[in-house]
Amino acid sequence: MKKVNVMIYMAFMITLEIVFTRFLSIQTPIIRIGFGFIPVAMSGMMFGPLLAGIVGATSDVLGMMIFPKGAYFPGFTLSAFVGAVIYGVFFYNKKVSVKRVLLAVGIITVLVNLTMNTIWLQILTGKAVKVLFVTRLVKEAIMFPIHAIVIYGAWKMVDRLEIMNKVAKFNK
């Protein structure tokens, strides 16, 4: 029964990620600004690295299948998995702290968003990495504090509402 409950919570987070990414985002060919990171970060808090990674990757694949915007590229699925795993490493069974949030968001910004995703976009578009990187660097500089503030606020809210205690009993 406990595993079923975890799967239900995971499905809910996948659904939220798809809705936040596909409907509540601004997207150009090389930049997407949205809030799909919130359910992915919360998955890291609730389920740990591996299950959060599954939520991230599944969200990417299902989102692309249900609401395609261009060709499917597995590199972005890998990026979604890696980003979610990083959230899980920094947030699962940990106390809320600004330092943890800044480290997680910083590593995801540099490793996933600026490095991996820029490489994937270069492969897909053929544009020079330098050109893509400059545009993406501006976007990431704007989004970094937004991500950090929103994730920290969500984590504090989850902590106050004792949601983690309720979910933790299903993870054992």
From Swiss-Prot:
Keyword Membrane included in the entry's annotation: yes
Keywords in alphabetical order: Cell membrane, Folate-binding, Membrane, Transmembrane, Transmembrane helix, Transport
Main location: membrane
GO molecular function: folic acid binding; transmembrane transporter activity
Residues passing through the membrane, by range: 6-26, 35-55, 71-91, 101-121, 131-151
Topological category with respect to the lipid bilayer: Multi-pass membrane protein
UniProt subcellular location: Cell membrane
Gene Ontology CC annotation, any one: plasma membrane
Function, as annotated: Folate-binding protein that interacts with the energy-coupling factor (ECF) ABC-transporter complex. Unlike classic ABC transporters this ECF transporter provides the energy necessary to transport a number of different substrates. The substrates themselves are bound by transmembrane, not extracytoplasmic soluble proteins.
Subunit text: Forms a stable energy-coupling factor (ECF) transporter complex composed of a membrane-embedded substrate-binding protein (S component), two ATP-binding proteins (A components) and a transmembrane protein (T component).
UniProt name for this protein: Folate transporter FolT
Protein's organism: Clostridium novyi (strain NT)
Upper lineage: Bacteria, Bacillati, Bacillota, Clostridia, Eubacteriales
Name of the gene this protein is made from: folT
